[in-house]
């Protein structure tokens, strides 16, 4: 019997499910990614339900707030973790790993990656690869999260649920692949969020024991501090892909639909100045003018004063006021 005539037997269902679930834990190993032929056949709209189940359960877990109740300390932890992790995404995953708008030490780079991984948006290599792809194809057919091309839902969250886009074009991030510690974060991208969730739970247990008057518990802190905070960071981040290419003002002619939106800038610590960013992605600052609120830039500037980062790339005046600016 020739190879062409051989009968192909699918592996047992349990093995297939196990293989799919194992892909949730990795992205760096080539064997975990769809083969080129699979990517060619896949339209990109096939949702990989086995892999996205944890993402969906994260939302369902927020409903447990009905049972765990409310306390001011739980709300405070939720807000702190929202700001810290949103900054980790905007300042580190976006402005550092994706665009290299400043420099840091190798140890600092790893710490930035750890902080970004705590936001449960996968590893820095995967995140940066997709974002660099977006800038090359912004609002063109190959832009996987363009609302202009694919509509609101797909640009907001549907794209990363797909089998096809679980993979990333690693040719765009060769500068990051040379660091084994970053590949480790991508390979085990669920590890840091798991540790954070456990830590938040234990904090609640401790506070219930030493300060019962605060009215919190391990389960309450887990629901508020981890699940609700994480989901809020999710959708705050996703609005930049979906809403900031639809609503707002275009200061510059960038060849795409990117907009500046003050409300999105507030909830994302400065990322809402998206038209500015697409006009000049190399700048560490996205609020080009003093009145454009950019908390991420202010925090990065503070870090530079402390010597943690350096060589912050500014917006050249000629770029800010030059060609492409609308009157």
Question: Where does each model-flagged region fall?
Answer:
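Non-catalytic, topology-defining segments of multipass membrane proteins
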Residues: 1-238, 283-327
